[in-house]
Amino acid sequence: MSRIGKKPVELPSGVSASLSGQTIEVKGPKGAQTFTATDDVTLTVEDNVVKVEPRGKSKRARQQWGMSRTMVANMVQGVTQGFKKELEIQGVGYRAQMQGNTLKLNLGYSHDVDFTAPEGVTITAPKQTEIVVEGADAQAVGEVAAKIRDWRRPEPYKGKGIRYKGEFIFRKEGKKK
């Protein structure tokens, strides 16, 4: 039995959920999100509670049970509080700045890297060495943060690059003479 899947998802005040077939739509103060569950699970909405139940006892049904419940819980959290990823830039001359909706990164390349935020995700640069990615969709926020980080991943010798806030970078010792 799924320990995660058997917990119902409670809808806080100001959040509504509507179900049509296998598709659930959650609306809240920060927007609306939809999720289509597989045929292995059954979704029910009653009394401000969303319940996810497996159809059958197959391994796939149990896997989808916990995953579907987590997706619905993330949607509820996204439309109420939102999600946020913070990135730090380390390195001499490495910096970030916003120009309208575009993030401009100086990362030691011969050119500046321009990154435009997709719809539903906002990017801010409160300092030249900090980037904040926010949005209602957890997957989109994580994907945008990972794409920004991929432009200059932290290297193990000096630790230069873009890292998540609080991320530990394994450091290596240089060559010995």
From Swiss-Prot:
Which Pfam families does the entry mention? Answer: Ribosomal_L6
What is the species of this protein? Ruegeria sp. (strain TM1040) (Silicibacter sp.)
Q: Molecular function (GO) terms listed?
A: rRNA binding; structural constituent of ribosome
**What PANTHER family does the record tag this protein with?**
60S/50S RIBOSOMAL PROTEIN L6/L9, LARGE RIBOSOMAL SUBUNIT PROTEIN UL6M
Q: List the disulfide bonds.
A: none
The gene for this chain is: rplF
The answer on whether this UniProt entry bears the keyword Ribosomal protein reads yes
Q: Which UniProt keywords apply?
A: Ribonucleoprotein, Ribosomal protein, RNA-binding, rRNA-binding
- One GO BP annotation of this record: cytoplasmic translation
Please report the name of this protein according to its UniProt entry: Large ribosomal subunit protein uL6
